[in-house]
Amino acid sequence: IAPLLLSAALVSCGSSSDQVDPKRPIFSPLDTTTMTEVQKYVQNYFGKKFNVDIRYNYEDRLASNLYKLGPASEAQALKYLNLMRYTFFEVYEKVAPKGFAERHTIKQLVLFGTLGYGPTQNLLGEAPFGMIQVYDINRLNIPYFDADDYEASTFNYYYQRARDNYIQTLYHESAHTLHQDSPVPEAFLKLTISDYQQDNAFSYWYVRGISSLTAGFISDYASKSPEEDFAELYGTYMVLLPEEWENLMVQADYKYKPDSRYTGREILERKLAIMKEYLKANYHLDIDVVRAEANRRICAMADYRKLPTTEAYYEFIKGDFSKLPPSYYSTIPKE
């Protein structure tokens, strides 16, 4: 998971903590007689269909001893589940090879309502022992462009937050399952092998006043390790619109050191090319096809006027993310 160094940080999911066998059944059906409608939705859709175990009711045994965590409300958990379904699982289901989502996406997910409050930093999430934990669910807000109370600045804040704090994390984590099955290509590693900073991934660039983009990393966090480099590149490329990606490449189009052979842009574009070849060779996955579908859905959240037609936007607004899908019946009160 990629940290954010503003009001909160997101603890990384090191490769040793992400070892979940994608072929091993994770989800076990439970007795539905005492379940809420949302719990049935989790079991019948996410569990049975994608073999993912999702928990949103607070369980002390799953909470970190290092951070203070609060429970997620069921209404907010439902928003997150629907956002995840629309921008992540349905994307893979529609355009990825058959069975890809079941084998190569997140397997265990725990939702908490608050930030992880700690003595030195506040966390947006972590991934202990392969169990992805997402915090701050109670502050998730999914804006609608044509809402009566629409205000551009507020809308853009919530849209960017929903995309960059929640959706990108899902793609980042799914990338870790890929390199666990098939290691990151050596050619990818060699491009910046001497510049990985491990636990100094943030302080190194900040102290020197250098953009990690110019060194060939899509984010400061990507410089932590080859595995996080791979996952950050995958997740970021997947959610950014083409013009946003190009803007990053323009910022990266400088040499990190005077004697550097390549600019950061050249390194990043080479890494991306290697990643694309790797995904096609090992998983028959065309990342540009998946990205186009992800962009289509995410773009609908931002502004339907950016789309060639309004089809995607109307598809988006037909689904109220605060409610269960039509095949379920919700008794959850409006917030």
Residue spans of the language-model regions?
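Active-site-flanking segments in enzyme catalytic domains
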Residues: N141-L272, K276-Y283, I287-V290, R297-I298, ...
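Acidic/polar, low-complexity intrinsically disordered N-terminal segments immediately downstream
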Residues: C13-A101, R261, L268-E335
